[in-house]
């Protein structure tokens, strides 16, 4: 059991790792890094990659954390509904309600990222962040 006094540090580690993972997803789409394939420049996938790269980096370093996390959460909600439900699930003929289940439509990552970023948005940057170093008061964007 981790003592309560370490909670701010474990949250900082959580924010940094989640931001880093999202940054990696973005760079896969934008530049083909980390085993990915670069998306065509003027495509929806490259736009998503840009949001993921920028927001992931901002969340990782803790700069403009709340707005970046809010935008990232919204992008993941759109990804789940537009890509996983309407495109993949309906393309497979899953229908309702099976098509809404993330395990059936491949949207588990999108749902987890969506609600993780919503939590980060509500909590803020915390320790080990540029926002914290700049002295932004709690609860302020």
What are these regions (language model features)?
Residues 1-31, 44-50, 54, 61-141:
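Extended, low-polarity transmembrane helix blocks
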Residues 38-44:
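Transmembrane alpha-helix entry/boundary detector in multi-pass membrane proteins
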């Amino acid at each position: 059991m981790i003592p309560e006094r370490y909670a701010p540090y474990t949250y900082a580690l959580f924010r940094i790792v989640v931001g880093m993972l999202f940054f990696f997803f973005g760079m896969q789409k934008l530049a083909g890094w980390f085993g990915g394939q670069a998306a065509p420049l003027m495509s929806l996938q490259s736009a998503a990659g840009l949001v993921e790269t920028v927001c992931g980096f901002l969340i990782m370093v803790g700069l403009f954390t709340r707005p970046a996390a809010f935008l990232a959460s919204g992008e993941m909600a759109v990804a789940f509904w537009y890509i996983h439900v309407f495109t993949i699930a309906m393309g497979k003929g899953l229908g309702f309600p099976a098509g809404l289940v993330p395990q059936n439509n491949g949207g588990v990552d999108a749902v987890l990222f969506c609600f993780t970023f919503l939590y980060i948005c509500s909590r803020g940057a915390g320790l080990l962040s540029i926002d914290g170093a700049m002295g932004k008061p709690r609860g302020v964007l």
